[in-house]
Amino acid sequence: YFMKEIMPLSSPTIVGKRQPFPFLKNGEIYAVVVLETRNKKERIGIIPCSNNMLTRMVELPGGKGRYMLIEDLILHYIGKVFKGYKVKGKSLLKVVRNADIDADAAYDEDLDYREFMEDLMKQRKKLSPVRIDLSREMDETVVDALCRYLDVTPDRVFRSEAPLDVSFVFQLQDLLRRNTELFYEKRVPQKSPEFKDGQSILQQITQEDKLLSY
C-alpha cells in the first residue's frame, strides 16, 4: 500500500545548500528523518504527511476495525523514500505558529469583511513558530538545527507519546459504527417521577423544589 498509494504522492525534501529549509504549515504533521550520507555527513529529510488525495486513516489487512495513521505509516517506511542514505533517527513533527492578530486594528471598512477574514486566516498560517511538537526523542544536535531553522528556543520543543493531531477520532467513530459492541447503549430519556402529567411544570416548581438529573 505504501509503495503504490503513498510513495508516488510524497514530496520529500533534503535540507542542504541547494535546498533551503521548507516552510512548515501551522498545525500540519511532517515526518522528519536524520540521514547519513556515504561521507558520514548528516542531512535532515522532511516529508509532508497531509495529502488531500489520501485518507488519514489506513485500514490494516484483516479488517476487524484495525487502523493506522498515515503519518505513522510514512515514518515507518521513510527509509524507502530516501534511498542511498542511512536513517539515523526519525520523528513526526508539528509546528505551532503564533495566531495573535488584532483583527479590529487591521480591518478597513472599505474592504469586504469575508475576504478580509480569509486573508487574515492565511496570514495566521505564516506567522512565526512558537512551539515544536515531536513524537520521538531526537539527537540534541538535530533538535538544535530544527530550532535554528524555525527560530524557536529549545525550551519550546516538546515530545508527546500521544498523536500530534487527534482530529482523526471523529473519522474513527464513523468508520467503527458497524462495530456496535464498541459503543455504549443509546440512552433513552425517561420521565421524572417528580412531575405529574397534565399539570404545568412551572406551577409544580413554584409549589416545591424538584430534582432532575441527566
Predicted regions: what is each one?
Residues 1-214:
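N-terminal localization/anchoring segments of enzymes in phospholipid and broader phosphate metabolism
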